[in-house]
Amino acid sequence: MSKKILVVDDEDDILHFLELVLREKGYDVATASGGHEALTKAQLEQPNLILLDIMMPQMDGWEVLKLLRVDEETADIPVAMLSARTEAKDRVQGLQEGAIDYICKPFSLQDLLVKIETIFEQVGKR
């Protein structure tokens, strides 16, 4: 059974690019273009990993992460923040609030794929 990744980003080009690449690598991919949709899909689809953008309208990634962590149905889903915010304080905040990784945009595809595999290895050892 392939692992399911939920990609959350309000930029359609990034969403579609990641969906295409991750499917080519054998992952089952779901997408959401906003925070409310992400929360619904996380509960319904129970992905193995969520790649979550921070800067989104209406509900940003920080709020989504907080709500994922307090819901017992989604609290244990690994979340990797995926953001153009590159300051150390943002990376620290993401990790302190429960993200398993913080990936800065722009990212290299190879780096992203290695990080995803590393996350699945870490989660598998728990």
Q: What are the language-model segments listed below?
A:
Residues 16-24:
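Charged docking surfaces used in two-component/phosphorelay signaling
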Residues 31-40, 61:
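Helix N-cap/capping motif at the beta->alpha junctions
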Residues 40, 62-75:
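Short amphipathic alpha-helix used as the core "switch/output" element in two-component signaling
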Residues 45-51:
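Active-site beta3 strand of CheY-like receiver
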Residues 56:
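Receiver (REC) domain active-site loop signature in two-component systems and cognate sites
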Residues 63, 86-103, 114, 118:
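Alpha4 helix (beta4-alpha4-beta5 surface) of REC/receiver domains from two-component response regulators
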Residues 117-126:
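The C-terminal output helix
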